[in-house]
Amino acid sequence: MPRAAAFAFSSSLPLEHREEAERILFFNLQQEKMKEGIRAVSKTYGLPKLVVTGEEGAQRLHMTTAKGLAVQTLFVTARGLGADGPVGAIVFTREENALVALYMAVHEDFSATGKFAGEKLMIRMLKELESIARRVRGVEVLKLYLGGETPITKKIRR
C-alpha cells in the first residue's frame, strides 16, 4: 500500500470497501495482541458486525454489535498517492457522560510496527474521537478499551 497523503474520517463506507473493512476489523494480524480486551468487550457489548444499509445503488457499510447496541463508527480512509480505501476504524458508544471506544483497528501497515508507523494513525484516530467528544453535550470522558479488561479513562479538555 503506498504512503497515504491524507486521511479522511467518515461514519460509513461505500459498499465496494466491504472486503477491505472486514479484513481490517475481523482478520487483522494484530488481533492476537488484543484478544483479552476483545473478549471482555464482546462479552459486555456484543461482537461487532458490519452491516449494509441503504437502497441498491446507494448502499453503505455501518457497524453494529451482535447485542444490537447503538454504536457509531469512525472509519478512516487513506487518500492520495494511489491509496483510497479503509485503513482504520473505531466503534464507539455513549454511556452517561462518556464516549466508550469498544473496538479499534488499523491496517497492519499503519500499526506501531508497520511500514507507515510514522503516520501515527491510531493517535490521529483517538484525537478525532476526542474532537467528536468535545462537541457532544454532556460528554466529559473517553473510555478506551486498549487490549485489557477495563478501559482507560481520559478526561475531555474543553
Where are these regions (language model features)?
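Hydrophobic, Leu/Ile/Phe/Ala-enriched alpha-helical segments that form helix-helix packing faces
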Residues: L25-L29, K33, A78, M125, ...
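A conserved beta-strand-loop-helix scaffold within acyl/acetyltransferase catalytic domains
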Residues: A40-A98
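Acyl-donor binding region in acyl/amide transferases
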Residues: E96-R157
